Curated annotation (Swiss-Prot):
May be ubiquitinated by NEDD4L; which would promote its endocytosis. Changing F1489Q: Strongly impairs channel inactivation. The record marks E330, Y362, N916, L920, E945, D949, M1374, Y1429, Y1443 as: Binds Mu-conotoxin KIIIA. There is a cross-link at K38 (Glycyl lysine isopeptide (Lys-Gly) (interchain with G-Cter in SUMO1)). PANTHER family: SODIUM CHANNEL PROTEIN TYPE 2 SUBUNIT ALPHA, VOLTAGE-GATED CATION CHANNEL CALCIUM AND SODIUM. It catalyses: Na(+)(in) = Na(+)(out). Residues 149-155, 209-214, 271-369, 395-401, 779-789, 844-845, 899-927, 949-961, 1228-1240, 1293-1300, 1357-1408, 1431-1447, 1551-1561, 1611-1623, 1678-1699, 1723-1752 are extracellular. This is Sodium channel protein type 2 subunit alpha. It comes from Rattus norvegicus (Rat).
Length: 2005
């Protein structure tokens, strides 16, 4: 890192780039070359080589550390600052804006050296900021010209001008940079390629005549892309997009693969089906019938000639081709489809079903060839208009094929689309991580640079200290402030411009300067975030001491303690320099400005852990601070050295804590004790600010300032921002905007202030807002006179109230302060608009102003946290995603222009192909606006219909390409955009408790006061009654303590973030810790001074207060842990356990100890008490003795019942009954009347079921007792459902069955299946998860409703009553405006008995409710076209609509779709996913959608790779078999099989519907060849692998496929000859597709994704079950309500609610919200002439075919919300989860594949699969592995050091080796332990045998033993020698002593080693001499494992231990 500091920062680092510099560079390069030998040069670009400094990249701004550029150096060549380029030929140029441009120092175009004046000039022009502006303007103007559809002639010259400017730009760039050879030249930048191509094309089209010019002209559109290259922020975004596309490669491959497979299936199943049409029987003709029959019999080979040559008068071909002979439904372009199978669509009387004519939708919807099938499948996957495809296919092929669609929708659509989502989300996450890390690294580098400045700073320090001593007033109440703004940068993607920051700063300055005049009355109770920042230093007096006390001990840290304030404001790049946090996960959290070492508070990972910040006791904390404002904090300024901080000690003395100088001479001033008012504090704060400013301007300061350039910058920044407003403005503001002229006025002001600022007034205003909203929502059409007058009066009143509120507030606060606050500005804006609107009420066309009143709704946000949050999220996202949105806009623009240029003319010329009356349809590309609308519609996911039109007029290939590009690119960007939105500005932290953390807002205070008042009255009444009646002291005594408690609670509302005392009481604390002022009752609660002292004296103290949400009582004080750093870790762990219960008030302990997360009641064999204790206490009769008499009998009865109820057979029986009774409901369709026997059976069954359920209920009552029964929610559900049955039974018995109420009750029987919920574990789990999410879903739903309300009211204002039109009701056509202009003319027609009718559109905006429905249709993109057409055509009330008269009303819908649909629906997805993640955390990270059983399956899947070493399949002894074996096991064999599979797939794709006989035969033989080949493969493998063949899963799969293929061939022959069942035949052919699936085996990426799917299956199964249950209930409900509805629009003979099957088919379609508008439309018919209420239905007593609009709307809306939002999103949540798990698994350093490899190698060394290997072979084994596990030779030492346990025979177990090797790869870590435990579990599961081998020793011990043995041997030899030589015995004794000393030491080592390895509880293991240590003791790591299901293993361990003892 030091390399980046080579160039000294500061102004002296800039040097001109001269010839000498160039020479020096050349010399360095030469030296470098000479130094290095040739080979090394190749590895030059190695990863570990030096990298360019990312801060000095071209295009970035110069970092602040370099200070200002001397003016003479601007735009001049300078030497490169980046050390990386020290030996590269480059130089840099800086412009005025300090942007870095880097150029190559070689000659440009071989002639211009860097010193050439021409090149210098070019460079000056290029880097000038205006140059970019010019190009930008040119591009934009050019874009405007491009949007013209028929440009006039003079535009040609304009074109030339543009081309000229672009050419000039490129020339400048080429002159300045060079063309293409060196780095940093023109063509080295990909963005310049774009320019180059654009210009070349411009010239080419000009001078060369190329024919189709319009196609080439479209290339000009790419100029719009140049905007991207000009705006710096966009480049990064585009980079990000490209990154995420790269990431998508795997998913794309999988998607294409799956779609191909499904398309092949579709091809086989539905080939040619969609051409079946209903043909009219020809004129009566006997020969025809013969022909027809022969036609059907020979249908496979008819050639189109007439069949019967004898009859030539009838030409079948011509007859079929004539369209008029087909059956058309009215209004349809395509003939009615039909099918020949029993469950397909039938033809009307007189028609037969024949395959003829073209396919539907211009012939583009079909499965006839692979390509069309693929398109259809792609359409299914993107779910665009798929209901149409679904209905056509089911009609033509039969309802059974619904299964195909279910599979494709669930596996294809939901799964694949969401996988794309998951991948994109992950790409984003990774990018965010990367930017964070980069920022961290930068901070470290800067820290080093700052150290270089240390010396300069120290000099400045002395001067500063002296200066501070001169100025007495320098000290302030809380530091002098440069106010940091890090909250604005808190959003991950935010790149707010410095301008904004400066403006904010400017506001603050004004505030501060005016602050001197601020008077006491201007106390504001509720301030927004902004004003909080303005209030300056949020830390309290003591807090500041705490923060800065230890700071000066290490001088170089001081500067960075102000982490973001110095550097961030001027940077424009995405991650501002210091805006990140080191170890804290949440960006922008509490201690951004504390040093890492001396962090004020321990960094806690959870944001909810509140901080203990003692607050200044004179200052009320402003109320409405939201989450973000915590991140915005005040920062004390740095006088020159940045080291002087002021602190206030406990006596109120302000001292300057600076370097030693400041400490030794503490200059301070006593704050007056207890008298300072809040205002004075504030005043003092602002005045001190002035002092600091004057101080800085003092001339004597200048020298010191020049010492450290960094500070110069900061100060300049201050002065600049201060001078933004000239001083005269402040004078003016003080004079005119602050009103405090005379005493009486001040008194008035004071009174007004008291009134306006009172919480009750706030409450009243809020109520007014709600009422006003209601009034606006009550408008409807048609309204009576009185009603509208009431509304207008109401509006006047509300306008008056709001105006009054505004004026009073202005009086109370002074205009200056009033407009300092965001909400007030907002109010002011709305009030002035309302007044304006009153003035302009009579002017036509300004009714739009009325919709501005709607913005008042947003005032609710002030007191409604979730709404506030939503607005913030949208605000943040719009800001943060500004760049992305821009990219999207550019893309939309480009495609709109391309569409217009390419297809505009064709639409005009070929319009008759797509429109009956040869008028341009609504969706065309002839003009730019319409082209834009089409592109927008494609982005909404509706591309297929417009594409058909396009293909019809402009040719298939071009249209397909353009539309697919828009679809993929646009949708990817949109998806990216909203994902980024959700990821960056949305986490449930802000959802759950936005405002809990801050002081209660005024509403809560007001409500609290009311509550208090009510309590007080209640208490007084109670006391009075007790005094009057019960004159007992005791009663009073009982009340007293409670009362006290209440008082305490009320008087002190503690708060999460800070412990603030006495909020309402505004008292002050004087120096001695007593309280003066109001509220002595609070004295007990004042935190004692000593607490603060402990803070101050021990800065390392931290307090963590874990809190449960939503509780704000003082009890939180008891949970604090005052702890020093030493026990911090522990409390952190505790916290992580407790704070995980976010969102609930109950802490669920970590489930680690083995208890289930849901604590179920203990299974006791005794029933519980019948009644609750309270009941027993009040009614003595409830208490029965169970010891004797009747009581005992009763008790025994209960015990018996309990046994019955608890028996699992009982439960099974009940479940069976529930299923039967639910099944019975499915039979009650419209045909039940005709099937009398079934009807009577059902009636009896119904009674039986009811009795059984009543019996069950009674049994449970007796067994469980009422208390237990009625406290269980599931029991309540049972109870209510049984009640319904009971009531209807009694009603039937009494003969009231025909009553309306009873009938509607009967429909409630549809809820019966709900009882199955509690019985099926899987569904119950999901429902619990859902219920957990309901609060936050409801919250967001409410917010969305408010949001939509605005659009709805706006819609009512714009369109109410304007959708009426006059139609001819026989033809259904609308009269033209020329014929009928208005209502009265229509009436005239009606009266003259014409067939006319004045009719409304069914879904309209006549009132707010219908408005909501319309908006829902628009948001789900279903039925939105009709609504939009009506809106666009509308003129005025009672006027006949005119085609596209009101064209720009489209924009209303576009805006709604963006905000109402994209934002709010995505927000839902965000909330749901987030919620489930939170619940998951709460349940200890397990999946909340799985039952225990399924979790086991899931874990098994996860551990799939854990295989035990298998015996390799032995090579057969037989010579022939051996040869085959060798051939089959070669890799070539596998690869060739794969190639064959691919070829087979291709041949299957070639098949088409209308292929010739010849082709069919060829394909038949090819297929035969493939079958033979695959059978051959199968046989070869069987020969060589013998019975082992079936041990491998894939082989079994292959085998089955081969068998099916062979059987299929024979069956196909049989079926063709004997049976005519084409479906069966087709299904059998599908078997061939199975072969393709074998490809999966080969592709790793696809395997990962499918693995993720496999892992999601259990959870998805549960969710699927729940979805089925919901569908079932709704189907039955639909059958009982809508069975007889008129068949029109979406309801017809196949898709209706008449039978259970049909209902399910319809509901499945709506699950994806497809086509629900069509099903709803007929149900909205409420009376004639739309439907006939008296119509008879044969065979049924029901009359009429009208629907019930209210029931229908409720039915569909609720179903859509439940299924679409909930289920689909749960699906998403599960997939995202498992996808990340699967990718993590594949991304870990050791994947399953590595373990497989380990075992494969193992098999060679351990052929008998003993699981052990001899120690001598270990070295070879380690060398034989592949990396990363490989340990190359020489590896003996490493292996010995691994200390592996050995068993007798010097053998080592494979697991131990694997552990040791993985440890080597992963390093020591917690993960390692987890992995080890996991592997051991897997192993134990598969090999119980392992335990029996007891290790005796380890490799290390073995080595030590060997060494010891050698030592002993040597000693003994020496001893013998000594004996022989007969030396003096004393020497011998000495020697002996040495040996004795030696051995014990060795033994100690061994013992230590053993203990080190053994687990804590087994430390009593004795040295190895007594008995072999247990296997566990040698292998287990230090950390104890807590696996509950491994109890048997533990027991074994215990036995071993006991035997040792």
């Amino acid at each position: 890192m030091a390399r980046s500091v080579l160039v000294p920062p500061g102004p002296d680092s800039f040097r001109f780039f001269t010839r000498e510099s160039l020479a020096a560079i050349e010399q360095r390069i030469a030296e470098e070359k000479a130094k290095r030998p040739k080979q090394e040069r190749k590895d030059e670009d190695d990863e570990n080589g030096p990298k360019p400094n990312s801060d000095l990249e071209a295009g970035k701004s110069l970092p602040f550390i370099y200070g200002d550029i001397p003016p003479e150096m601007v735009s001049e060549p300078l030497e490169d600052l980046d050390p990386y380029y020290i030996n590269k030929k480059t130089f840099i140029v800086l412009n005025k804006g300090k942007a870095i441009s880097r150029f190559s120092a070689t000659s440009a175009l071989y002639i211009l050296t860097p010193f050439n004046p021409i090149r210098k000039l070019a460079i000056k022009i290029l880097v000038h900021s205006l140059f970019n502006v010019l190009i930008m303007c040119t591009i934009l103007t050019n874009c405007v010209f491009m949007t013209m559809s028929n440009p006039p002639d003079w535009t040609k010259n304009v074109e030339y001008t543009f081309t000229g400017i672009y050419t000039f730009e490129s020339l400048i760039k080429i002159l300045a940079r060079g063309f293409c050879l060196e780095d940093f030249t023109f063509l080295r930048n990909p963005w310049n390629w774009l320019d180059f191509t654009v210009i070349t094309f411009a010239y080419v089209t000009e001078f060369v005549n190329l024919g189709n010019v319009s196609a080439l002209r479209t290339f000009r559109v790419l100029r719009a892309l140049k905007t991207i290259s000009v705006i710096p922020g966009l480049k990064t975004i585009v980079g990000a997009l490209i990154q995420s596309v790269k990431k998508l490669s795997d998913v794309m491959i999988l998607t294409v693969f799956c779609l191909s497979v499904f398309a092949l299936i579709g091809l086989q199943l539905f080939m040619g089906n969609l051409r079946n049409k209903c043909l009219q029987w020809p004129p009566d003709n006997s020969t025809f019938e013969i022909n027809i029959t022969s036609f059907f019999n020979n249908s496979l080979d008819w050639n189109g000639t007439a069949f019967n040559r004898t009859v030539n008068m009838f030409n079948w071909d011509e007859y079929i081709e004539d369209k008029s002979h087909f059956y058309f439904l009215e209004g349809q372009n395509d003939a009615l489809l039909c099918g020949n199978s029993s469950d397909a669509g039938q033809c009307p009387e007189g028609y037969i079903c024949v395959k003829a004519g073209r396919n539907p939708n211009y012939g583009y919807t079909s499965f006839d060839t692979f390509s069309w099938a693929f398109l259809s499948l792609f359409r299914l996957m993107t779910q665009d208009f798929w209901e149409n495809l679904y209905q056509l296919t089911l009609r033509a092929a039969g309802k059974t094929y619904m299964i195909f669609f279910v599979l494709v929708i669930f596996l294809g659509s939901f799964y694949l689309i969401n996988l794309i989502l998951a991948v994109v989300a992950m790409a984003y996450e990774e990018q965010n991580q990367a930017t964070l890390e980069e920022a961290e690294q930068k901070e470290a580098e800067f820290q080093q640079m700052l150290e270089q400045l240390k010396k300069q700073q120290e000099e400045a320090q002395a001067a500063a200290a002296a200066a501070s001593a001169e100025s007495r007033d320098f000290s302030g109440a809380g530091g002098i402030g440069v106010f940091s703004e890090s909250s604005s940068v808190a959003s991950k993607l935010s790149s707010k411009s410095e301008k904004e920051l400066k403006n904010r700063r400017k506001k603050k300055k004004q505030k501060e300067q005016a602050g001197e005049e601020e008077k006491e009355d201007a106390v504001r109770k509720s301030a927004s975030e902004d004003s909080i920042r303005k209030k300056g230093f949020q830390f309290s007096l003591e807090g500041s001491r705490l923060t800065y006390e230890k700071r000066f001990s290490s001088p170089h840290q001081s500067l960075l303690s102000i982490r973001g304030s110095l550097f961030s404001p001027r940077r424009n790049s995405r991650a501002s320099l210091f805006n990140f946090k080191g170890r804290v996960k949440d960006i922008g959290s509490e201690n951004d400005f504390a040093d890492d070492e001396h962090s004020t508070f321990e960094d806690n990972d959870s944001r909810r852990d509140s901080l203990f910040v003692p607050h200044r006791h004179g200052e009320r904390r402003p109320s409405n601070v939201s989450q973000a404002s915590r991140a915005s904090r005040g920062i004390p300024t740095l006088p020159m050295n940045g080291k002087m901080h002021s602190a206030v000690d406990c006596n109120g003395v302000v001292s300057l804590v600076g370097g030693p100088s400041a400490l030794t001479s503490p200059v301070g001033q006593l704050l007056p004790e207890g008298t300072t008012t809040e205002t004075e504090i504030r005043k003092r704060r602002s005045s001190s600010y002035h002092v600091s400013m004057d101080l800085l301007e003092d001339p004597s300061r200048q020298r010191a300032m020049s010492m450290a350039s960094i500070l110069t910058n900061t100060m300049e920044e201050l002065e600049e921002s201060r001078q933004k407003c000239p001083p005269c403005w402040y004078k003016f503001a003080n004079m005119c905007l602050i009103w405090d002229c005379c005493k009486p006025w001040l008194k008035v002001k004071h009174v007004v202030n008291l009134v306006v600022m009172d919480p009750f007034v706030d409450l009243a205003i809020t109520i007014c807002i709600v009422l006003n909203t209601l009034f606006m929502a009550m408008e409807h059409y048609p309204m009576t006179e009185q009603f509208s007058s009431v509304l207008s009066v109401g509006n006047l009143v509300f306008t008056g109230i709001f105006t009054a509120e505004m004026f009073l507030k202005i009086i109370a606060m002074d205009p200056y302060y009033y407009f300092q606050e965001g909400w007030n500005i907002f109010d002011g804006f709305i009030v002035s608009l309302s007044l304006m609107e009153l003035g302009l009420a009579n002017v036509e066309g300004l009714s739009v102003l009325r919709s501005f009143r709607l913005l008042r709704v947003f005032k609710l946000a002030k007191s409604w946290p979730t709404l506030n949050m939503l607005i913030k999220i949208i605000g943040n996202s719009v800001g943060a995603l500004g760049n992305l949105t821009l990219v999207l806009a550019i893309i939309v623009f480009i495609f709109a222009v391309v569409g217009m240029q390419l297809f505009g003319k064709s639409y005009k010329e070929c319009v008759c192909k797509i429109s009956n009356d040869c008028e341009l349809p609504r969706w065309h590309m002839h003009h730019f606006f319409h082209s834009f609308l089409i592109v927008f519609r494609v982005l909404c996911g509706e591309w297929i219909e417009t594409m058909w039109d396009c293909m019809e007029v402009a040719g298939q290939t071009m249209c397909l390409t353009v539309f697919m590009m828009v679809m993929v690119i646009g949708n990817l960007v949109v998806l990216n955009l909203f994902l980024a939105l959700l990821l960056s500005s949305f986490s449930s932290d802000n959802l759950a408790a936005t405002d809990d953390d801050n002081e209660m807002n005024n509403l809560q205070i007001a409500v609290g006061r009311m509550q208090k008042g009510i309590d007080f009255v209640k208490r007084k009444i109670r006391e009075f009654i007790q005094k009057a009646f019960v004159r007992k002291q005791k009663a009073l005594d009982e009340i007293k303590p409670l009362e006290d408690l209440n008082n305490k609670k009320d008087s002190c509302i503690s708060n999460h973030t800070t412990i603030e005392i006495g909020k309402d009481l505004n008292y002050l604390k004087d120096g001695n810790g007593t309280t003066s002022g109001i509220g002595s009752s609070v004295e007990k609660y004042v935190v004692d001074e000593s607490d603060y002292m402990s803070f101050i004296n021990n800065p390392s103290l931290t307090v963590t207060v874990p809190i449960a949400l939503g509780e704000s009582d003082f009890e939180n004080l008891n949970t604090e842990e005052f702890s020093s750093e030493s026990d911090m870790e522990e409390s952190k762990e505790k916290l992580n356990a407790t704070s995980s219960s976010e969102g609930s008030t109950v802490d669920i302990g970590a489930p680690a100890e083995g208890e289930q997360p849901e604590a179920e009641p203990e299974e006791s064999l005794e029933p519980e008490a019948c009644f609750t204790e309270d009941c027993v206490r009040k009614f003595k009769c409830c208490q029965i003795s169970i010891e004797e008499g009747k009581g005992k009998l009763w008790w025994n009865l209960r015990k018996t019942c309990y046994k019955i109820v608890e028996h699992n057979w009982f439960e099974t029986f009940i479940v069976f009954m529930i299923l039967l009774s639910s099944g019975a409901l499915a039979f009650e369709d419209i045909y039940i009347e005709q099937r009398k026997t079934i009807k009577t059976m059902l009636e009896y069954a119904d009674k039986v079921f009811t009795y059984i359920f009543i019996l069950e209920m009674l049994l449970k009552w007796v067994a469980y007792g009422f208390q237990m029964y009625f406290t269980n929610a599931w029991c309540w559900l049972d109870f209510l459902i049984v009640d319904v049955s009971l009531v209807s039974l009694t009603a039937n018995a009494l003969g009231y069955s025909e009553l309306g109420a009873i009938k509607s009750l009967r429909t409630l029987r549809a809820l019966r299946p709900l009882r199955a919920l509690s019985r099926f574990e899987g569904m119950r789990v999901v429902v619990n998860a859902l219920l957990g999410a309901i609060p936050s879903i409801m919250n967001v739903l409410l917010v969305c409703l408010i949001f939509w309300l605005i659009f709805s009211i706006m819609g009512v204002n714009l369109f109410a009553g304007k959708f009426y039109h006059c139609i001819n009701y026989t033809t259904g056509e609308m009269f033209d405006v020329s014929v009928v202009n208005n209502y009265s003319e229509c009436q005239a027609l009606i009266e003259s008995n014409q067939t006319a009718r004045w009719k409304n559109v069914k879904v309209n905006f006549d009132n707010v409710g219908l408005g909501y429905l319309s908006l829902l249709q628009v948001a789900t993109f279903k039925g939105w076209m009709d609504i939009m057409y009506a809106a666009v055509d509308s003129r005025n009330v009672e006027l006949q609509p005119k085609y596209e008269d009101n064209l720009y009303m489209y924009l209303y819908f576009v805006i709604f779709i963006i905000f109402g649909s994209f934002f709010t629906l995505n927000l839902f997805i965000g909330v749901i996913i987030d919620n489930f993640n939170q619940q998951k955390k709460k349940f200890g990270g397990q999946d909340i959608f799985m039952t225990e059983e399924q979790k086991k399956y899931y874990n098994a899947m996860k551990k799939l790779g854990s295989k035990k070493p298998q015996k390799p399949i032995p090579r057969p002894a037989n010579k022939f078999q051996g040869m085959v074996f060798d051939f089959v096991t070669k890799q070539v064999f596998d690869i060739s099989i794969m190639i064959l599979i691919c070829l087979n797939m291709v041949t299957m794709m070639v098949e088409t519907d209308d292929q010739s006989q010849e082709m069919t035969n060829i394909l038949y033989w090819i297929n035969l060849v493939f079958i033979v080949l695959f059978t051959g493969e199968c046989v070869l493998k069987l020969i060589s692998l013998r019975h082992y063949y079936f041990t491998i899963g894939w082989n079994i799969f292959d085998f089955v496929v081969v068998i099916l293929s062979i059987v299929g061939m024979f069956l196909a022959e049989l079926i063709e000859k004997y049976f005519v069942s084409p479906t069966l035949f087709r299904v059998i052919r599908l078997a061939r597709i199975g072969r393709i699936l074998r490809l999966i085996k080969g592709a790793k990426g696809i395997r990962t994704l499918l693995f993720a799917l496999m892992m999601s299956l259990p959870a998805l199964f549960n969710i699927g079950l729940l979805l089925f249950l919901v569908m079932f209930i709704y189907a039955i409900f639909g059958m009982s309500n809508f069975a007889y509805v008129k068949r029109e629009v979406g309801i017809d003979d196949m898709f209706n609610f008449e039978t259970f099957g049909n209902s399910m088919i319809c509901l499945f379609q709506i699950t994806t919200s497809a086509g629900w508008d069509g099903l709803l439309a007929p149900i909205l018919n409420s009376g004639p002439p739309d439907c006939d209420p008296e119509k008879d239905h044969p065979g049924s007593s029901v009359k009429g075919d009208c629907g019930n609009p209210s029931v229908g709307i409720f039915f569909f809306v609720s179903y859509i919300i439940i299924s679409f939002l909930v289920v689909v999103n749960m699906y998403i949540a599960v997939i995202l989860e498992n996808f990340s798990v699967a990718t993590e698994e594949s991304a870990e350093p050791l994947s399953e594949d590595d373990f497989e490899m380990f075992y494969e190698v193992w098999e060679k060394f351990d052929p008998d699969a003993t699981q052990f290997i001899e120690f001598c072979k270990l070295s070879d084994f380690a060398a034989a592995l592949d990396p990363p596990l490989l340990i190359a030779k020489p590896n003996k030492v490493q292996l010995i050091a691994m200390d592996l346990p050995m068993v007798s025979g010097d053998r080592i177990h494979c697991l131990d080796i694997l552990f040791a090797f993985t440890k080597r790869v992963l390093g020591e870590s917690g993960e390692m332990d987890a992995l080890r435990i996991q592997m051991e579990e897997r192993f134990m599961a598969s090999n119980p045998s392992k335990v029996s081998y007891e290790p005796i020793t380890t490799t290390l011990k073995r080595k030590q033993e060997e060494v010891s043995a050698i030592v002993i041997q040597r000693a003994y030899r020496r001893y013998l020698l000594k004996q022989k030589v007969k030396k003096v015995s004393s020497i011998y004794k000495k020697d002996k002593g040495k040996e004795d000393e030696g051995t014990p030491i060795k033994e100690d080592i061994i013992t230590d080693k053993l203990n080190e390895n053994s687990t804590p509880e087994k430390t009593d293991v004795t040295p190895s001499t007594t008995s072999p240590p247990s296997y566990d003791s040698v292998t287990k790591p230090e950390k104890e494992k807590f696996e509950k299901d491994k109890s048997e293993k533990e027991d074994k361990g215990k036995d071993i231990r006991e035997s040792k003892k």
